[in-house]
Amino acid sequence: MKKNIFINIFIIVLSLFPAVVGLAGPVDVAKAKELARKYISSPVSVAETSDGFMAKSRRYSDDSPALHMFNNQNGEGFVIVAADDRVGGVLGYSDKGSLDTQNMPAPLMALLTDYTRAVEAVRVDSISVTPYYVKPPKAFVKPLVSAEWSQDYPYNYYTPRSSTSGKPTYTGCTITAMAQVLFAHRWPKMRPEGVIRGEGAMAYDYYDWDNMLDSYSGGGYSEAQGQAVGVLMRDLGKLAQATYGVNGTLCDEGKLWNALQYYYNCSVRQLEKDRLPGGEFLQAIYQELSLGCPVFMTGGDHAFLYDGYDENGLVHVNWGWAGLDNGYFDINTAATAVTTKIR
């Protein structure tokens, strides 16, 4: 029996679709707060520092903000609003956590940069952004991935230590993202032949899915629970020939796809957005999410997951940073590109 998994293996940033400019333009803080209140009760502007992300239009003469970002003063949650309604209204939101410009997943930082470029484009070139309209198969899909995993302990329980410093190495964002997809499917049941055996959970010939937790943040987990997720991470890294490091772990996506096909009984095909007409790429994402298949994304040095969408078509993103800044985002304004499907 083969398992359905949906994977995206590359990202191309920012695809804009010019349209006739209507009666639209800048969105001030007051109007942005009004939009934000639909998602959080008491929006307060996210503090920006010289060391953090400055969502400013570098080419706009009055240096007005490209984005308005708000946290919920009375609880958890955040909202990101475009400062020009020719780009769109709410670009991202979450009912959990809060945005910290100095502690943000790198792929989210890249997405905010793409949003900023979109606003720059409409301001400088006086165009409006009209993303392709795609109707999802279902009204919405709740997040399919319950895991909020990361790259450090206990996920790196069995990763090799540095040969020079003896320090533990990271699992790598690619391995963590794919491990979360496999966890969502609880697939495979048995560990592949040929992986290194050892003591404890490493001696098992199966994956101990029942002992893996949605989150290990804050501690409170048992040794067996830590080992269970560590085995999955180590097997994926080993089979994909990951290059481990104390500052970061690299993984060739092609080798990971080969490992998934050969060891995990999956088949892989690739779709490139630039070669697809209209909104076919976005439709493919909606379709797979509607079938219960998380979408794996990677581009540059980052990997993360699409695992749901809301009534407005914003896609839920799991950044792979232990749940940090997970939320719903507009992936149509800052368009993305290459997709791979694993069966």
Place the predicted regions along the sequence by residue.
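Exposed beta-strand-loop-beta-strand "reactive/processing" segments of non-cytosolic proteins
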Residues: 46-89, 94-95
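Low-complexity, Gly/Ser/Thr/Pro-rich intrinsically disordered linker/tail segments
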Residues: 334-343
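Catalytic Cys-His active-site segments of thiol-dependent hydrolases/isopeptidases
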Residues: 82-84, 88-98, 312-331
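Boundary at the C-terminal end of the N-terminal hydrophobic targeting segment
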Residues: 18, 22-26
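Short, non-transmembrane alpha-helical segments in secretory-pathway proteins
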Residues: 25-59
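Bacterial N-terminal signal peptides
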Residues: 8-19
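Active-site-adjacent substructure of cysteine-protease-like catalytic cores
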Residues: 55-75, 258-318
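Active-site-adjacent structural segments surrounding the nucleophilic cysteine of cysteine proteases
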Residues: 87-247
